[in-house]
């Protein structure tokens, strides 16, 4: 999600260390200590303006959430939502999420969310897709045995590619939704993109895949 630079975004992020972890590499292996409990930890890569991760944190107080985004302006808007939600079970990271092993130990997180990732449709950019095999190998390191990836997209090509990638990696497809909003799936929390697409009547695809 590209947005204009927000004046004062850096200062806003730095002013709220209770939510924004500015040196997450130093937190590697210490996330339970940082949250102050041993609750499960769920991570969203590419949190955008934070509607999903803040909504999930509010709905599930027994789970700790971490939202990651590389764009400081975008993350500052996510922080606005977190401050408005006023829940303790959420942290934000202003980092590149391409190698999550920089910030998490083996098996340290319990679930990963990939919502409306860049589809990188050109074949020469395949390795940049967040469901490419090398990314899956990284995710497997930081997730436990049977750890899950929950994936949503509006892009049919990325959806089909990801189904194949998950399967070829040996993951179990626990659930596949060809039209999420027309299904009986409960407790769906929308992202900003998802709300926009839903308003236009676009189909949303969803997958739950688990490592074995």
UniProtKB/Swiss-Prot annotation:
Substrates-to-products reaction catalysed: guanosine(46) in tRNA + S-adenosyl-L-methionine = N(7)-methylguanosine(46) in tRNA + S-adenosyl-L-homocysteine
PROSITE patterns in alphabetical order: SAM_MT_TRMB
GO CC field: tRNA methyltransferase complex
Entries under Gene3D superfamilies matching the protein: Vaccinia Virus protein VP39
Residues of the active site: 118
UniProt GO molecular function: tRNA (guanine(46)-N7)-methyltransferase activity
Cited function: Catalyzes the formation of N(7)-methylguanine at position 46 (m7G46) in tRNA.
Full protein name: tRNA (guanine-N(7)-)-methyltransferase
Source organism of this protein record: Streptococcus sanguinis (strain SK36)
Gene name as annotated: trmB
